[in-house]
Every structure is written in structure tokens, then in C-alpha cells.
A protein has these predicted regions:
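Rossmann-like NAD(P) dinucleotide-binding subdomain of oxidoreductase/dehydrogenase enzymes
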Residues: 103-248, 300, 376
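Conserved residues at the C-terminal ends of beta-strands
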Residues: 130, 189, 209, 256, ...
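Conserved C-terminal structural/oligomerization subdomain of aldehyde/semialdehyde dehydrogenase
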Residues: 2-3, 51-57, 203, 240, ...
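Short, structured beta/alpha segment
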Residues: 2-82
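ALDH superfamily catalytic-core signature
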Residues: 213-356, 419
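Residue-level signal for inorganic ion chemistry
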Residues: 53, 91, 151, 183, ...
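Residues at or immediately preceding the N-termini of alpha-helices
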Residues: 50, 64-67, 246-250, 278, ...
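Long amphipathic alpha-helix in the N-terminal Rossmann-like dinucleotide-binding domain
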Residues: 65-68, 72, 82-103, 115
């Protein structure tokens, strides 16, 4: 039900403001969202503010029992969602048939049997949506929207490190009067709440964004029940800078490595720069990197804290590995200490040169504000080197020559290649990775196909009874 006065926008703003105004660890504990009701869990866990390194709110530590309750609510709601008036369903069926005809140029009426064939897309059922911590609202919404449009009901499992955003979003669904049980959310750790969602026999589909290690386990577990799976996993994204690149693009190239502290799966972490401009480029790039302001994200800064202490230690470890492997650290590379946030997890943009392609910092996903720059000579050489890792999520190419751009893009093994730009997203285009970076594609048509099952219906109009 909507709020009594219909003024849900003001109520929604008040919920957010209360979160902002509450001192660390003094806000009331958060709750799961099951069948349009905010339900207290069996137990809570601390959510840590990475800017200060201190707990700031308690969130549910979701159990298998709570996941089961959310799935049961979604399963029950699916019966109602499927109960569409016959006239509306007929309209959908023949609209699909017309769309199929227009897109394939095939006649519907077969001369021999006078049959009409059309394709109907049915919702799959209960969808399990497991989203990561780095872009918590965007990446959850990117899954939620097509899943709901296709007619599914959902159980969301946001990262336990950034569950507050999803909790606020659930308030929006409740305030606007979304049908009971269509959208549900369970917070908690992946090894408990997430694992139960993957294993549940009434969850027919899993959409996951996260690490390659966890994604491969989800794929293995889901295969036992033949569930549909979409996996958007890790990356070690290359950027290729040709000697004739536009120098005005240097700021965008740096941004492609350090936006959101480098905690975006699409960030550039390996830069291949053509030899004639290598030294000049590194100098200009370091100057750009040093312009990024590191600080508490409540102020006007470009680089905030690493998401967690564990992740912060991981990034620091890779920087130490780079030093031990003979890498040259041009900037960053050390903990940044901030007044009032001495225990926060801050690392300044770090630029490294002098590492071979086989080094860990050139092959492993670091997922932080760390980039390795290395020279190359020819297009053939750099394409082979860029494709040499086990990942294939995205890449960037920078050149003033259109043929050079397109020839390189065509040879790169990546789900998305940006030419003279970065993160320019057209949401109708397929999105996903190659190799160890993912399975499946999402985005408009691809999402609707993933979140639905295609059914072919053949009707013999010539039959007489």
C-alpha cells in the first residue's frame, strides 16, 4: 500500500536524512525485507564505515531460514504476477508474433498447414539477484529492472559491506505500493545467505556480479539444478595508447583507472603506451594522477576509502609485490593519513612502471587505484599482450587514426571496447565479459531474453472440428 497521504517522496527523503544525521553506530539496526514487511533477523552484524574504519550501523546476518522465507514470499507472489487478464495476454502474444515477423522477415502462414507460429516470452519465476559492494545501487537496479519487467519476482542479496543502499531502495518499493512479495531482500554474508539463495530449489535464475572465484562456484552449484546463470566477474582491463593519441584525452585515460578508487570492474589497470611517447606519457599521466584529491567522501574529493580493511590490505600487498618484482612507483603506493579519519582505508592513486607482463600486478585483478604502464612497439605485439590474461571484460584504445582504432578493437578479446572514450554506456547494448570475466550478457534485449523463457506456439488455423 502507498502511504496514506500519498506523499511518499517526503517520507523517502526523511528515511535517507535520518541515516545521514545518525552518529556512527547509533542508528537503529537494519532489517530484511520480506513480503513488503521489514523483518528483524535472528542476529545482526556490524557494517563498518571505511572512511573511519569504525562500525557505524548493524545489519542482518541473514540465515538460510530467512532466505527460505523470502523465496517463499516471492514464489507466492509469482502466482499473482502470472494471473494476467486473458485479453492483455492475447495482446502480448500477437504483439510478440508481429515483432518476430518484422525482425526476421519470415511469413507466419505456412502454405501446407495454414499454421501461425509465434514466440511468447514467459517469466522464469523467482530470480536471485546477488550484487556487489562497489556500485551498490546502480548494479542492483541494473538487475532488478529487467527482472521485474519480464514478469519475475525477486530475492535480492546485496553485499554485506554495502547493504544500506539496498535497504533504502526497499523502502521505495514499499512506499509506492509495490505488490506484496514481488521484491524481497535478505542481507548477510555470501557463504550463508548467498549460498542458500543459489542452492534453493525454488530459485530458477541467478544473476551475479562479483569476483571470478565466487562466480565460478555459483556456476558450478547452479549447474546441478540447471539454473539459468548470468555472471559478471573480474577483469584486468587493458588500455592501448598509440603514439598519435590526442593529448587532450590524458585526463580521461587517468580517470579510467582511478574513478571510484579504481573499484569499478571496468577500470583500466594495464596501460600499454607506444614507445616513441612512453616517457612523455608517463610524466603527464602521473601529473594527472596527483590531481586526484584523497579524502572523506562526505567532502568534495575524487578518491575515497577502500571498501574494507581486507580489501585495503589486499591492495597494499600488491603494491609491495610490485616493489619486490622491480617495479618503479611514480606516485602513491602508501597509506594516506587524514585528520579525523586516521583509521580509514585510504590509498592515493598509484602508478607503476618497469614490470614484465608475467608479474602479478600485470595479471591479477587488484581492484584499487593502482595502474601499471608498459611500452609497446607494434599493433600486433600489443594486441597479443593485451589478450594474454585470463580476463576479458573491457578495454580502451586511444588513437587519432580511425582504422587503427577499429582494427585494434576488432582483435581484442573483451566484452566491451571503448575507442577514444571510457564508460560511455548505451544501456541497450550487450554487456558482459569473455573468458574468466563472465558468462552471458545483459542489457535491454539480452536482459529480457535472460530473464524470460522463449516459448514457440504453433496454431493450425485450417483445422476443422
Amino acid at each position: 500500500m502507498t502511504t496514506s497521504n500519498g506523499n511518499y517522496r517526503e517520507e523517502f527523503k526523511a528515511i535517507i536524512q535520518k541515516l545521514i544525521d545518525s552518529p556512527d553506530n547509533q542508528h537503529e539496526p537494519l532489517t530484511n525485507f520480506i513480503a513488503n514487511s521489514f523483518e528483524k533477523p535472528e542476529k545482526w552484524m556490524d557494517s563498518v564505515n571505511p572512511a573511519t574504519g569504525k562500525p557505524w550501523i548493524k545489519i542482518p546476518d541473514g540465515s538460510a531460514i530467512e532466505v527460505d522465507a523470502a523465496v517463499a514470499a516471492a514464489k507466492e507472489a509469482f502466482k499473482t504476477v502470472m494471473d494476467i487478464p486473458r485479453c492483455v495476454q492475447n495482446f502480448r502474444d500477437f504483439a510478440n508474433a508481429a515483432l518476430y515477423t518484422l525482425s526476421t522477415s519470415k511469413i507466419l502462414e505456412q502454405p501446407a498447414g495454414k499454421c501461425v507460429n509465434y514466440v511468447k516470452h514467459d517469466p522464469v519465476g523467482v530470480a536471485g539477484l546477488i550484487s556487489p559492494w562497489n556500485l551498490p545501487l546502480y548494479l542492483l537496479s541494473f538487475k532488478l529492472a529487467p527482472a521485474l519487467v519480464a514478469g519475475n519476482t525477486v530475492v535480492c542479496k546485496p553485499s554485506e559491506m554495502t547493504s544500506v543502499t539496498a535497504w533504502v531502495l526497499m523502502h521505495a518499493f514499499k512506499l509506492v505500493g509495490f505488490p506484496v512479495g514481488v521484491v524481497n531482500m535478505i542481507m548477510g554474508e555470501g557463504k550463508t545467505a548467498g549460498q542458500r539463495l543459489v542452492d534453493h530449489p525454488d530459485v530458477h535464475l541467478i544473476s551475479f556480479t562479483g569476483s571470478t572465484v565466487i562466480g565460478k562456484k555459483i556456476q558450478e552449484d547452479s549447474a546441478k539444478m540447471n539454473k539459468k546463470v548470468s555472471l559478471e566477474m573480474g577483469g584486468k582491463n587493458p588500455g592501448i595508447v598509440y603514439a598519435n593519441y590526442r593529448k587532450s584525452d590524458i585526463a580521461t585515460i587517468a580517470r579510467s583507472s582511478f574513478l571510484n578508487q579504481g573499484e569499478i570492474c571496468l577500470c583500466t589497470s594495464r596501460l600499454f603506451v607506444q614507445k616513441p611517447i612512453f616517457e612523455e606519457f608517463v610524466k603527464s599521466y602521473v601529473e594527472e594522477a596527483e590531481k586526484f584529491t584523497v579524502g572523506n567522501p562526505t567532502t568534495a574529493v575524487q578518491i575515497g576509502a577502500m571498501n574494507s580493511k581486507i580489501h585495503y590490505e589486499k591492495v597494499k600487498k600488491y603494491i609491495e609485490i610490485a616493489k619486490n618484482e622491480g617495479g618503479n612507483i611514480h606516485c602513491g603506493g602508501v597509506k594516506t593519513i587524514l585528520n579525523g579519519c586516521e583509521d580509514g582505508y585510504y590509498i592515493a592513486p598509484t602508478v607503476i612502471t618497469g614490470l614484465p607482463d608475467s608479474s602479478q600486478c600485470m595479471t591479477d585483478e587488484i581492484f584499487g587505484p593502482v595502474v601499471c604502464i608498459t611500452p609497446f612497439e607494434t599493433a600486433e605485439e600489443v594486441i597479443e599482450r593485451a589478450n594474454s590474461t585470463s580476463y576479458g571484460l573491457s578495454a580502451t584504445v586511444w588513437s587519432a587514426n580511425t582504422d587503427e582504432l577499429l582494427n585494434t578493437a576488432n582483435e581484442l578479446r573483451a566484452g566491451t571496447v571503448w575507442c577514444n572514450t571510457w564508460l560511455a554506456r548505451e544501456l541497450s547494448m550487450p554487456f558482459g565479459g569473455c573468458k574468466q570475466s563472465g558468462t552471458g550478457r545483459e542489457g535491454l534485449h539480452d536482459s529480457l531474453h535472460f530473464y524470460s523463457d522463449a516459448k514457440t506456439v504453433c496454431v493450425n488455423l485450417a483445422a476443422k472440428y
